[in-house]
């Protein structure tokens, strides 16, 4: 129950370095519930292996999280999360810089 709305990002994406990996966190809102796809470059990522994908839902507000474990230099670069529902879609871009 709520007004239909296309995906809208609520804040800048946050990248947090963990002990052995990184966490990407994106806050957004939309209604109805979206389809969520994470990408590295143009390649869609799937859950499993070193990738853990989670979301928390509070009404129409979503926190989208992806964690990458055992990060190596090859993991650096551009990522995005695509969020799509029947009202539209949005993308949030994240850049993972791995310095020494």
Which residues fall in each region the model found?
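Immunoglobulin-superfamily
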Residues: 1-100
